[in-house]
Each structure stands twice: as C-alpha cells, then as structure tokens.
Amino acid sequence: MGSTVSVPQTRTMRGDELSADDAWATLRKYGGWQLTRDSLVRFRYGDGMSHSRALAFQVCLAIIPGAIALVGLSSVTHQEELGQVLELTLRRLAPGDGEAVRQALGSGHHVRDALALWLGLATTMVALTTAMAQFERGANRIYGVERDRPFHRKYARAAVLALVAGVIMITGFTVMVGGGAIGEAMTEVFGWGGGTRQAFALVRWPLGFLLALVATVTLFRASPRRRQPGHSWLAFGALVALVLWTLFTLALALYTAHNSTFGATYGPLTAVMALLLWSFLSSIALFLGVAFAAQLEACRAGCVPPAHPDTGPTAEEEREPLVGAVGSAVIAAVRRVVALLGRKRPGRTS
C-alpha cells in the first residue's frame, strides 16, 4: 500500500462540478513548480513506478495477440484488405527489419480456425480488461484510496472501459504515432491518391490527439474509487499525460532509430523490446497525469500534502553495525584528507 495522503472530494464541497476555469485559478494560486514537485512526490509514494510496470505488461499482453487475431480474422471474414493495412502498418512501425513482426502476423494468416481466432481476440479483451483494472488500482493509490472496488464492480467497470476508453486510446495513439505508416499502407492497398494522403496527413494529428484526450479524461473520471470533478478539470491532468507521452515516444523513436546496437543486441526481439519500453513509458505518463490531477485537486481542498510524514527508523537506527562502522571510518578518513590538503595549501597574500 502507498503512503499518499487521501485527496478530499472537492466535488461535494459545492453544488456544481469543478471546471477548467477552477483548475486554472488553482494552478495560478498553487504555482507550477510546487505542483510539479508535490505531484512527483505523490507519484513516488503512490507506487507509481510499480503500477506502471504492471500496466505496461498487461498492455503488451493485449496488443501482441490482438494484432495476430485481427490479421487472422480479416482472412476468415474475407476482409483481407483491412488485414493487409494492419500488417503493413505494424511492419513499418517496428524498429529493425521487422522480421519477427512479419512472422508473428503471418501466423495469423495460416490459422483458418475461426474459433481459435475469436478465442485469441477474447483473450486480448481479457488482457485489456485487466489492464484497466490495474489502472484503477494505481489511480486509487495515487489518490490515497487504499481499497479498490469489490471484485464484480471493479472488473465489470474495467471491461466497459476496455471496450470504450481502451480501444479509443489505442486508436488515437496509433493514428498519431503511425499516421505516416497508415497512409502508406492505405495507398498500397486501396490506391489512395496524393490529395487523399495529404488530407489524411493534416487530419491525423488533431484527430488522434482528440481521441487520446477523450479516452484519457474518461479513464481519469471513471477509474478512481471516488467522486471525481468535471471532465474539463481532469483535462489538465490528461494534457500533462499526453505531453509526457509525446515526449517519451519521440525520445524512444530517436533512440531506436539512431542506436545501431539496440537492434544488434536484441535481434529478432527488437520490436518486442521496443513495444515493452513504449508501454512502460506510456504507463508512466498516464500515472504522472493522474498524480498532477490529484495534487491539483488536493490544493483546491486546502493544499493537502502529497504524502504522510516518514515514521520509519532513522538512518542511525536502520544502519547495520558493520556497515555503520565501515561508513564512519571512510567518512572520517575523507575528512582527515580534506583537512590535510587544506593545511598544505599555500596561503594567499593580500
């Protein structure tokens, strides 16, 4: 369990919901630097990194089998063009030569059993549902809520969020990150002209951003076990999450594109490792956005501190006897050396 301070439910303090104007006024009163510092503290003591790792793992379990199942189902349902667009897009997005992606997606073409493919898609939805449940757990800890909803309510809500917010978020992220690859795939499969590609290139950024923003605000509103403020208030934290996600994605893209040792190290697993890193960084961005939204609401309620005071043992109490003795001896030796060097330094004449 985390040690974050519970955020008061400001939605019940007045008759109406908090809006974007309230968020802006609170931010100006609070100060950007203090909000950033306290949000990072709330993220840390809410076990944000641990929940980010768990969420990234669940997202990968949903994306990989889901892509294989969709490519296979496109052949079974005689929608080969859509399957080709998906396959070409993923192969262009994958770093390296994309051989592992080609083989994985090719296995979907060889599977002609519709039942097996539908079961694979169902497995993807189960993994995405558990990812939404994991997001609820992480958001609760960051807000200072120590217990999640009962099992049936938690996973029923997570299933709905997976079908709504999860699918919309993945679509928005894919349109923004892979818009160029999607345009090339659509041109190759459906014969898009230059005008259509240019129009798609102009529309994909605002469209993808809007889809990702709507999905993120929906997650921030529906996931925590508390009465959340209005959507426009939560849009502040969602914007922080999307800005961080964009920066993380660009940094990862530059790293994989200009680091030749990355592909040489992982070989055919390069695409999988890139997906793991991207999922982890995306999860960090989401939970940091939750932390910013939570701390801003805490300030609205009276500048509640982000974490409880440390009641653990002091440094002297937790230090092992041998380690403490060795450390004290090293510190004493360093101090003697510094003092000796100070005495040997020639004095300056005025």
Region locations from a protein language model:
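Membrane-embedded alpha-helices and immediately adjacent juxtamembrane helical segments
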Residues: 2-350
